[in-house]
């Protein structure tokens, strides 16, 4: 499985993945960690909701007919908040056959997969012994 980086990928890449059976995580063009985390995150500022929604919508419309895509990703390292909750809700309303992941959602509702980056072996072991896990873990 390959994860597209949070920038639009060349259309030929999608064709190659479809043709040769490579599974793909397609990722919305959202990365704003340079603007801050926590309260300063653009994910929590509804002024940026339209931009988040537009980029998620464009990803979906561009890629929805590619069979190689098995997971949608809402973006990369952009904090978590109302903007990602709304984009998750929208994406699940139009597409309910493929899971949606968002790394910064951690264990919040707006991700179907626990997909934390840069985890240690101890972090993985700690997740696996939790009693209430119901999401797959992908690095």
Residue ranges and their predicted role:
Residues 1-139:
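Substrate-binding/catalytic cleft of secreted carbohydrate-active enzymes
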């Amino acid at each position: 499985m390959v994860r597209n980086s949070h920038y639009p990928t060349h259309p030929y890449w999608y064709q190659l993945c479809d043709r040769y059976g490579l599974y793909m995580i397609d990722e919305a063009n959202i990365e704003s960690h340079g603007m801050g985390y926590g309260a300063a995150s653009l994910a929590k500022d509804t002024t940026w909701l339209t931009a988040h929604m537009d980029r998620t919508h464009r990803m979906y419309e561009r890629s929805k007919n590619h069979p190689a895509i098995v997971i949608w990703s809402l973006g990369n390292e952009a904090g978590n908040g109302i903007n990602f909750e709304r984009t998750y809700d929208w994406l699940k309303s139009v597409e309910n056959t493929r899971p949606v992941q968002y790394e910064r959602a951690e264990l919040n509702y707006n991700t179907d997969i626990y997909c934390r980056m840069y985890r240690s072996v101890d972090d993985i072991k700690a997740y696996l012994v939790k009693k209430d896990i119901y999401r797959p873990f992908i690095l």
